[in-house]
Design a protein with these regions (language model features):
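Intracellular juxtamembrane helix-capping segments at the cytosolic ends
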Residues: 139-153, 369-383
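C-terminal transmembrane helical hairpin of 12-TM major facilitator-type secondary transporters
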Residues: 323-375
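Extracytoplasmic gate region of multi-pass secondary transporters
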Residues: 49-54, 247-309
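Central cavity-lining transmembrane alpha-helices of secondary-active solute carriers
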Residues: 70-88, 302-314
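A late C-terminal transmembrane helix in Major Facilitator Superfamily
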Residues: 172, 382-415
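Cytoplasmic membrane-interface "Motif A"-like loop-to-helix N-cap segments
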Residues: 92-103, 320-333
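Glycine-rich segments within core transmembrane alpha-helices of 12-TM secondary carriers
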Residues: 158-184, 395-406
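C-terminal membrane-cytosol helix-exit motif in multi-pass small-molecule transporters
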Residues: 184, 215-234, 432-437
Length: 446
């Protein structure tokens, strides 16, 4: 006879999602929505730098293209490192304290960038420090996702994790859309902060607004988390958690997720700069065409993460129905083809070729949503419950280095070398997914 669920305290007693008698769907879904709200603010924090970097030189900073690529790459490096820490926290401190603490940590880089952009003499090294701190926003992913996984049965894991990751990923698009928009006017309560001059058009611009606009929402997330969330008594020490590295599926799924989310996050962080440097006002076309007629990275940068995150959120139920492996495979094939197509337009002869480049890039983001949703459905199905949370955290940590890898390689080998290198890596990863998971009679279907 099942032990009765006790949910009156802060810690859920006898919680077992696989048994209807010891699972409460209301608690599970409430946990999902509150932590997803906090995760969305976290991803806004992570990609704050990519929204601000394209306009820094317009307000008086004197940064090279290489320095701007590094600024947008450092949050990815930091995120990966932070995820290696956060992946161990869910069974140690519990969901409630984890989400609350994380929401408060988002305030540090927000306030830091608010003050930094006000002073154009801010040294580059300090901008790098603030960029590193922004990585906290993405780092919490490897804590939130395993934590949410404790609350749902396997049959709903694809839907739950797909919704959380997909909606959370929308924060990347949200900040790149809202950030440039709120730079255009004074925010309520901040009208006393004088705007800066936009050297590109002579107008005024409120760059600090991009850092300030989500501060109230981070505080709300902390309050909601502390008052509404509960903890699941899943306990595991460090030694018990690192046994995931003896399972070969950990490494194959890491490669697959590095393709899926690593590329999604890496291209998202660099998308605006790539547009500006190849087709926009920083490109060679600016010498012969009116810069005002050339595409602006800030106008298109949000589209990629919006599409990829939206598809990821919507595809969770389909992964529950058909399995994740086939969608990871289809996503990998599509990403390979679209990235190769985009690579053909990295040395354009006319600005009109931009639309081909944009189309292929948005196609790559679209298929990344398939692959991201698929891999996160596979993990709980292939791995035992205690290991699946750790593998979700680990793969998320490694894939989070995507923005850093993208920025580092683009600045060192150039965009064409980076794009074609991605094509080769995608082929390898997709082949592994087919051999081990997606083909008929695969050894580990999921």
């Amino acid at each position: 006879m099942a032990t009765e669920l006790r949910a009156d305290g802060r810690v859920l007693e006898n919680w077992n999602p696989e048994n209807e008698e010891t699972w409460d769907s209301k608690i599970a879904w409430r946990t999902l929505w509150v932590s997803t709200f906090a995760l969305t603010i976290g991803f806004c924090t992570w990609y704050l730098v990519s929204a601000i970097a394209p306009v820094l030189n317009d307000i008086g900073f004197d940064l090279t293209k290489g320095q701007l690529y590094w600024l947008t790459a450092i949050p990815g490096l930091a995120c990966g490192l932070f995820r290696l820490v956060f992946m161990f926290l869910p069974p140690v401190i519990g969901t409630r304290k984890l989400v609350t603490m994380s929401s408060l940590l988002f305030l540090i880089p927000m306030f830091g960038w608010f003050f930094a952009v006000r002073d154009t003499s801010t040294p580059f090294w300090w901008l790098l420090v603030l960029a590193f701190l922004a990585g906290i926003g993405g780092g919490v992913f490897s804590g939130f996702m395993p934590s949410t996984g404790y609350f749902f049965p396997k049959r709903l894991s694809g839907t739950a994790l797909g919704l959380q990751a997909g909606i959370g990923n929308l924060g990347m698009s949200l900040i790149q859309f809202v950030g440039p928009w709120v730079m255009g006017f004074g925010l309520l309560g901040l009208s006393f902060v004088a705007p800066q001059t936009n050297n590109s058009d002579g107008g005024t611009i409120y760059v600090h607004n991009a850092a300030a606009v989500f501060i109230p929402w981070a505080i709300i997330a902390a309050v909601l988390s502390w008052t509404l969330l509960k903890d699941v008594p899943v306990k595991a020490n460090f030694r018990q958690q690192i046994d995931i590295f003896g399972n070969k599926n950990t490494w194959i799924l890491t490669i697959a997720y590095l393709m899926a989310f690593g590329a999604f996050s890496g291209f998202s962080a660099q998308f605006g700069l790539l547009i500006n440097n190849i087709y926009g006002r920083e490109s060679a076309f600016a010498e012969t065409f009116d810069p005002a007629t050339l595409p602006a990275g800030a106008s298109f940068a949000f589209l990629g993460p919006l599409i990829g995150a939206g598809v990821r959120a919507l595809w969770g139920p389909l992964c529950d129905k058909f399995g994740g492996a086939i969608w990871t495979f289809i996503g990998g094939v599509g990403m390979t083809v679209c990235t190769a197509g985009a690579a053909l337009f990295l040395n354009p002869s006319h600005p009109d070729q931009f639309w081909w480049f944009l189309g292929f890039m948005l196609g790559m983001f679209f298929f990344s949503g398939f692959a991201n949703a698929g891999t996160f459905k596979q993990m709980p199905m292939i791995l035992p419950p205690r290991q699946s949370g750790g593998v979700i955290g680990w793969t998320g940590a490694i894939a989070a280095f995507g923005p850093f890898i993208a920025g580092m390689l683009i600045s060192s080998v150039g965009a064409p070398g980076f794009f074609w290198g991605c094509v080769v890596f995608f082929i390898i990863a997709t082949t592994l997914v087919w051999i081990y998971y997606a083909r008929p009679n695969a050894p580990f279907p999921g």
